[in-house]
Amino acid sequence: MDVFMKGLSKAKEGVVAAAEKTKQGVAEAAGKTKEGVLYVGSKTKEGVVHGVTTVAEKTKEQVTNVGGAVVTGVTAVAQKTVEGAGNIAAATGFVKKDQMGKGEEGYPQEGILEDMPVDPSSEAYEMPSEEGYQDYEPEA
């Protein structure tokens, strides 16, 4: 029973770690997209640059929103997967239903994923500083 519950706990931790990596990857991709769009914008005529910068900012905002949704979705899937595995274990007689979700002392365990904050404004969403960018000055 303890081995089974520890295995489920480790599975939850793995899914949470994967979700964090996904969130970081999405944020990094948004930064790279912005860099690329700004580079192209610096090579275009004056009137287009403002539009390209606006598109880059909107892309960054949307990716941030999607990143938060991905983490929330993965967290929900992980929780349902663990619940389903526990139900299967109880149905097959591997563990007793009255022992499901209880620690060694017999008290209910706190869920890892329920208490995990999902904050789209966390550090994983910080974009690279724009110090390396320079405003476009059109040639006369």
Swiss-Prot record:
Question: Where is it expressed, tissue-wise?
Answer: Found only in brain (hippocampus, brainstem and cortex). Specifically expressed in neuronal cell bodies and synapses.
Acidic residues: bias regions:
128-140
Query: What are the boundaries of the region Disordered?
Result: 99-140
Return the protein name.
Answer: Alpha-synuclein
InterPro entries xref list: Synuclein, Synuclein_alpha
Q: List the SUPFAM superfamilies.
A: Synuclein
Positions carrying Phosphoserine are S129
- Repeat region (sequence), residues: 20-30, 31-41, 42-56, 57-67
From the record, give the cysteines joined by S-S bonds.
none
Annotated region (4 X 11 AA tandem repeats of [EGS]-K-T-K-[EQ]-[GQ]-V-X(4)), positions in chain: 20-67
Tell me which species this is from.
Answer: Rattus norvegicus (Rat)
Q: Output the lineage of the source organism.
A: Eukaryota, Metazoa, Chordata, Craniata, Vertebrata
Modification comment: Phosphorylated, predominantly on serine residues. Phosphorylated on Tyr-125 upon osmotic stress.
Start and end residues of each stretch annotated as Interaction with SERF1A: 111-140
